[in-house]
């Protein structure tokens, strides 16, 4: 049986942690930053964990990570 292809867009956006969770970055950080507060921009820099409801679908996109 052939290997499953990794979705290259997903591979650039997500990373797996040591415990198997999937990390993601926040949106709304690329432009129109003057209207956002310093606190909001600082919090958006940190990474987040993918919600449990989305985990299964994203894991299918990155099978070998």
Swiss-Prot record:
> What InterPro entries does UniProt report for this protein, alphabetically?
Ribosomal_bL35, Ribosomal_bL35-like, Ribosomal_bL35_CS, Ribosomal_bL35_sf
Q: What is this protein called?
A: Large ribosomal subunit protein bL35
**Record has Ribonucleoprotein as a keyword:** yes
User: Gene3D superfamilies recorded for this chain?
Assistant: 4.10.410.60
- Region annotation Disordered: residue ranges? 1-45
Q: Which gene encodes it?
A: rpmI
Q: Which organism is it from?
A: Geobacter sulfurreducens (strain ATCC 51573 / DSM 12127 / PCA)
Q: Which GO terms describe its molecular function?
A: structural constituent of ribosome
Q: What GO biological process terms does the UniProt entry carry, in alphabetical order? A: translation
Cite the record's Basic residues compositional bias ranges. 10-26
Please give the superkingdom of this protein's source: Bacteria
Instruction: Give the taxonomic lineage as stored in the record.
Output: Bacteria, Pseudomonadati, Thermodesulfobacteriota, Desulfuromonadia, Geobacterales
Similarity annotation: Belongs to the bacterial ribosomal protein bL35 family.
